[in-house]
Amino acid sequence: MCTGVRFSDDEGNTYFGRNLDWSFSYGETILVTPRGYHYDTVFGAGGKAKPNAVIGVGVVMADRPMYFDCANEHGLAIAGLNFPGYASFVHEPVEGTENVATFEFPLWVARNFDSVDEVEETLRNVTLVSQIVPGQQESLLHWFIGDGKRSIVVEQMADGMHVHHDDVDVLTNQPTFDFHMENLRNYMCVSNEMAEPTSWGKASLTAWGAGVGMHGIPGDVSSPSRFVRVAYTNAHYPQQNDEAANVSRLFHTLGSVQMVDGMAKMGDGQFERTLFTSGYSSKTNTYYMNTYDDPAIRSYAMADYDMDSSELISVAR
């Protein structure tokens, strides 16, 4: 399971991050794909003549960078989140469309587009083709894509591709994005205001303290509950003005829905936990990351690497 968040500062800079929740690590690390790195898409999907530099979290398999989440130098970011039971992909390319393998979709987006507007326009003629990496299960995902202005959710299902405008700038897992947005209406009366004193008959009632207005916000770690809680937190967090404060906001917002070992078992009996939290700032073109066992937030600035190199860069954590 996973959670994603996007917001911007008063200068329009992107802050984008995610939790990755699972029972075991894939050996993920920070990967940098410089502008000069040569990458052939599986089905020949087109792109920029001079691609963007990309930084994010992922693994290298079959000599290919596979990003769980990533961003480019123009402030466009993308994350793949689990979507089983709803995601449905073709397994062969479709003639007359731009065919993109699901495992390379984050890199293809970040490498070739500068804004959500550009991505949304191009998706009209894109087919997402599920290519299963040898030794791995099929990845049944939906994607959260954001920039300094807005975010969208891309869900490929049996009835086609759905591209949703995400007005709360968050995403979790299944059910569909439409369900999550409809479900928010159950919490319209929730407030961050201090509850006013009231009277019931002859009894005068006063709040115990802050937080009474939040009564009803779900506290479990199921996908619908995390969506409600992170949407509430993201919508009510006070606007911040500098890099450190916004990175703090990002990690605290995602911290409100982190999964702790022992809280919830998966179908195989293993406990799910937040393996890592990652975040990106377009203000400084810096990726941030911490892990379950090391909560210290580490930073990886694009400026620290050769963005014109022809070599893929894997950064030891």
Swiss-Prot record:
Induction: Is part of an operon containing at least two genes, bsh and glnE (GlnE is glutamine synthetase adenylyltransferase). Deoxycholate binds at residues 2, 18. It comes from the Bacteria. It catalyses: glycocholate + H2O = cholate + glycine; glycodeoxycholate + H2O = deoxycholate + glycine; chenodeoxycholate + glycine = glycochenodeoxycholate + H2O; cholate + taurine = taurocholate + H2O. Pfam families: CBAH. Optimum temperature is 40-45 degrees Celsius for the hydrolase activity. Is stable at temperatures from 4 to 37 degrees Celsius. During 30 minutes of incubation at 40 degrees Celsius, about 20 to 30% of the activity is lost, and at 50 degrees Celsius only 20% of the activity is retained. Its EC number is 2.3.1.-, 3.5.1.74, 3.5.1.24, 3.5.1.-. Taurine binds at residue 82. One of its GO terms (biological process) is bile acid biosynthetic process. Belongs to the peptidase C59 family. Possesses dual functions in bile acid metabolism. Acts as a bile salt hydrolase that catalyzes the deconjugation of glycine- and taurine-linked bile salts, which occurs naturally in the intestines of humans, releasing amino acid residues and deconjugated bile salts (bile acids). Can hydrolyze the amide bond in all six major human conjugated bile salts, namely glycocholate (GCA), glycodeoxycholate (GDCA), glycochenodeoxycholate (GCDCA), taurocholate (TCA), taurodeoxycholate (TDCA) and taurochenodeoxycholate (TCDCA). Shows a slight preference for glycine-conjugated bile acids as substrates. PANTHER family: CHOLOYLGLYCINE HYDROLASE, HYDROLASE. NCBIfam families: bile_salt_hydro. Homotetramer. The tetramer consists of a dimer of dimers. This is Bile salt hydrolase/transferase. It comes from Bifidobacterium longum. The lineage of its organism: Bacteria, Bacillati, Actinomycetota, Actinomycetes, Bifidobacteriales. The gene is bsh.
